[in-house]
């Protein structure tokens, strides 16, 4: 999900291809597909669907949980309201934003709410960054990742409400469902009862599950968690220096707890194993899930993210006078003599100027595009430790409806796979009563990112054979593959390893008029969709607070954001 830049004329052809391949949110270039010739029935079906009118859906899954009265939701709502109620600027700032993922979209949305005029530039021809998706020749969508919207995402939930699209979230029953590797084809559930408040509903879910953890293991795990419960956020942040495995050993938590629960959780949160993941990441998730009644409740988007989530944000931005441009890749950050930003130079030769600039693309791209005069500034130097993690998203269309699955997210507990879902069940736009489409996160992916798609599919099928022993075999003697798509993201969210927290930057940089947005920037939700949206709000807040300074700053003083050919 990340990309790189700082391109010179000499290496432009190579760099452009490299950038495209690593473009934020993964890229279509890296998403290859394969079709079995006998899929005419599938082609006929999808052609009919692709010629239909606009998607018409009404959410009829589990009713939307009552989130509006939670402390975190109200806090997020207050921050959103502060932009709408901010004094209208005498002359709106023209803010140029690079990157139309959730962080860039959020930044532009809230700046527009505050009365300013964002110009949002996206390098590719698709919105969404890490939630980008593409439609194939049959009209079927394939995505950068398997995206889950938690009740514990207050800023994301507010965003849906502000856009009037709450009905586009398909809420699932309040459960976490894990495959049982020792019992192929079987699952174990953690069911959270609605009648109990937090944290009792979470405690009840853990205590009632006797298939994954024994009572002595549960007790030792609970004792190990006591310092986090008592110490609060300060304790959580102090654990950044320990990996999950190190923390568990330090707290005397049995190793089997890590094996049974936290390998799956680590891979789901950051695509890496618990011997690498910072314990802070796990504790933040547990904190939200245990303190909020509906925190761990999950929802799927009812269709593809670019159309069902990103476009409503774009429509909102444009309705308030902002602009959004695709196919506008940053080649260079050009500086004034005093080291401030003069313009963004695009790969098409155009320059874009404004009153303020936001870099909302992933951290790996920023590091490649960072101007030489900035590289030794501590604020930017610390970014060296922040590196995107590779991940692979796999989509497989089968010739039949698989039975051993649920209308929910499933934790595979496989060595190669993380979470997966039968999207023909969980998502209205992808619904199919006759055939299953499994979307699977292949992680950790570092050793596989350079392998061929056929290698990845072969390995995936061997894992699926364990999850569907009666329905899938690796040699396809049972369910047959009609087609597949493999989307490789060489650099996704930043790798949340120990001691990263001090390296995460504030949204306001030391360069006057230059700001950052992205889940790697400082906010409490780490690498997530919620973190991206919140970072955009913090970035917008910084710009609104700096209005007088930006309005009075030298040659950029309230200039129109311009795009000029060079």
Swiss-Prot record:
Pathway: Carotenoid biosynthesis; lycopene biosynthesis. GO terms for biological process: carotenoid biosynthetic process. Homotetramer. GO terms for molecular function: phytoene dehydrogenase activity. Gene3D superfamilies: FAD/NAD(P)-binding domain (3.50.50.60). It comes from Arabidopsis thaliana (Mouse-ear cress). Substrate binds at residues 288, 527. InterPro entries: Amino_oxidase (IPR002937), FAD/NAD-bd_sf (IPR036188), Phytoene_desaturase (IPR014102), Zeta_carotene_desat/Oxidored (IPR050464). Pfam families: Amino_oxidase. GO terms for cellular component: chloroplast; chloroplast envelope; chloroplast thylakoid; chromoplast; cytosol; membrane. This is 15-cis-phytoene desaturase, chloroplastic/chromoplastic. The lineage of its organism: Eukaryota, Viridiplantae, Streptophyta, Embryophyta, Tracheophyta. It is an enzyme of class 1 (oxidoreductase). It comes from the Eukaryota. Its main location: plastid. It catalyses: 2 a plastoquinone + 15-cis-phytoene = 9,9',15-tri-cis-zeta-carotene + 2 a plastoquinol. Belongs to the carotenoid/retinoid oxidoreductase family. The keyword Oxidoreductase applies. Its EC number is 1.3.5.5. It is found in: Plastid, Chloroplast; Plastid, Chromoplast; Membrane. Residues 1-86 form a transit peptide. FAD binds at residues 103, 122-123, 130, 147-148, 153, 330, 519, 529. Its cofactor is FAD. Keywords: Carotenoid biosynthesis, Chloroplast, Chromoplast, FAD, Flavoprotein, Membrane, Oxidoreductase, Plastid, Transit peptide. The keyword Cytoplasm does not apply. It is a peripheral membrane protein.
């Amino acid at each position: 999900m990340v990309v790189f830049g700082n391109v010179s004329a000499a290496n432009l052809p190579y760099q452009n291809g490299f950038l495209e391949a690593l473009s934020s949110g993964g890229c279509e270039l890296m998403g290859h597909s394969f079709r079995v010739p006998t899929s005419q029935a599938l082609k006929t079906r999808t052609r009919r669907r692709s010629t239909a009118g606009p998607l018409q859906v009404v959410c009829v899954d589990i009713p939307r949980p009552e989130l509006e009265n939670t402390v975190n939701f109200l806090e997020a709502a207050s921050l959103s309201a502060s932009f709408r109620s901010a004094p209208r600027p005498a002359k709106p700032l023209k803010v140029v934003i690079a990157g139309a993922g959730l962080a860039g979209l959020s930044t532009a949305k809230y700046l527009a709410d505050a009365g300013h005029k964002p110009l949002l530039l996206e390098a590719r021809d698709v919105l969404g960054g890490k939630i980008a998706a593409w439609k194939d020749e049959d009209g079927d969508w394939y995505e950068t990742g398997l995206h889950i919207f938690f009740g514990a995402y207050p800023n994301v939930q507010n965003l849906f409400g502000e856009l009037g699209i709450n009905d586009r979230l398909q809420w699932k029953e309040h459960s976490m469902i894990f495959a049982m590797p020792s019992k192929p084809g079987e699952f174990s559930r953690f069911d959270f009862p609605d009648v109990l408040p937090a944290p009792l509903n979470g405690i009840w879910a853990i205590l009632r599950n006797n298939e994954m953890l024994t009572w002595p293991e549960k007790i030792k795990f609970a004792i190990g968690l006591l310092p986090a419960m008592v110490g609060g956020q300060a304790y959580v942040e102090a654990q950044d220096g320990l990996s999950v495995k190190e923390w568990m050993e330090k707290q005397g938590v049995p190793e089997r707890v890590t094996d049974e629960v936290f390998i799956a959780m680590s891979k789901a949160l950051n695509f890496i194993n618990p011997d690498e993941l910072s314990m802070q990441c796990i504790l933040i998730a547990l904190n939200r899930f245990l303190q909020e009644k509906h925190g761990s409740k999950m929802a799927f988007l009812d269709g593809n993210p670019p159309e069902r989530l990103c476009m409503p944000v774009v429509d909102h931005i444009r309705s308030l006078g902002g602009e959004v441009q695709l196919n506008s890749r940053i080649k260079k950050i050009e500086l004034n003599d005093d080291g401030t930003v003069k313009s963004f130079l695009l790969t098409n030769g155009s320059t874009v100027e404004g009153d303020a600039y936001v870099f909302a693309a992933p951290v790996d791209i920023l590091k490649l595009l960072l101007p030489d005069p900035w590289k030794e500034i501590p604020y930017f130097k610390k970014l060296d430790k922040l590196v995107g993690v590779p991940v692979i998203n796999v989509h497989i269309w089968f010739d039949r409806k698989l039975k051993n699955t649920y209308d929910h997210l499933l934790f595979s507990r496989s060595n190669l796979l993380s979470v997966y879902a039968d999207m023909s069940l969980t998502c209205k736009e992808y619904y199919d009563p006759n055939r299953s489409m499994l979307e699977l996160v292949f992680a950790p992916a570092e050793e596989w990112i350079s392998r061929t798609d056929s290698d990845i599919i072969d390995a995936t099928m061997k894992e699926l054979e364990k999850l569907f022993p009666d329905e899938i075999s690796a040699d396809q003697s049972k369910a047959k593959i009609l087609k597949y798509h493999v989307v490789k993201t060489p650099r996704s969210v930043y790798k949340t390893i120990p001691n990263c927290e001090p390296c995460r930057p504030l949204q306001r940089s030391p360069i006057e008029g230059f700001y950052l947005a992205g889940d790697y920037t400082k906010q409490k939700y780490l690498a997530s969709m919620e973190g991206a949206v919140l970072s955009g709000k913090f970035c917008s807040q910084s710009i609104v607070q700096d209005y007088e300074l930006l309005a009075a700053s030298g040659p950029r003083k309230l200039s129109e954001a311009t795009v000029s050919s060079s």
